[in-house]
Amino acid sequence: APLLGKEALVAVRTKILPCAHVVTPNIMEAEILSERSIRSMEDVKDAALRIHELGPTAVLIKGGHLTGQDAIDVLYDGQSFTELKSVRLDSQNTHGTGCTLSAAIAASLAKGHTLVSACHLAKSYVTEAIRNGFSIGQGYGALHHLWASGTFPDSIKPLS
């Protein structure tokens, strides 16, 4: 079942997106927002154009759900496209990647980085958080947000 009903989706398109600086939909979300299917990089770029027309300053479509040896995200800033590539990691420890990416972009922008630089930094950070992620509970495992510190707090260590 879709997370948002039709009325809520209309509100996202007409009220929220026009106020957004950067939106970061995954492939499935981008298909809904752009009202088109996405199967290729050209489709991703067309979807980014369509979403951009709804009002956000920039659109970063996350390519983690596409196939291929690389995970390629596409940033469109209203003028040009930038592809952000990383090696596709074979990991189930991906819970929270979208929220973490958005937060890392916002933090990098707040620190004064350009949009392109902020997106590159955020993608690198999330890639390493996935690479260093851990299985906890059932289902998708967690990212290791503190990977750069080299520490793993006892409070979040798996019990097994």
What are these regions (language model features)?
Residues 64-66, 87-90, 123-126:
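Glycine-rich beta-alpha junction loops
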Residues 65-66, 98-100, 104, 141-143:
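Gly/Ser/Thr-rich beta-alpha loop segments that engage phosphate groups in nucleotides
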Residues 81-82, 108-122:
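Phosphate-handling active-site elements
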Residues 81-95:
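Short pre-catalytic strand/loop immediately N-terminal to key active-site residues, enriched for Gly-Thr
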Residues 2-81:
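Conserved phosphate/ATP/ADP-binding segment of small-molecule kinases
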Residues 76, 102, 106-110, 123, ...:
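Regular secondary-structure segments
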Residues 32, 91-115:
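Short, small-residue alpha-helix embedded
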Residues 116-160:
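Charged C-terminal helix
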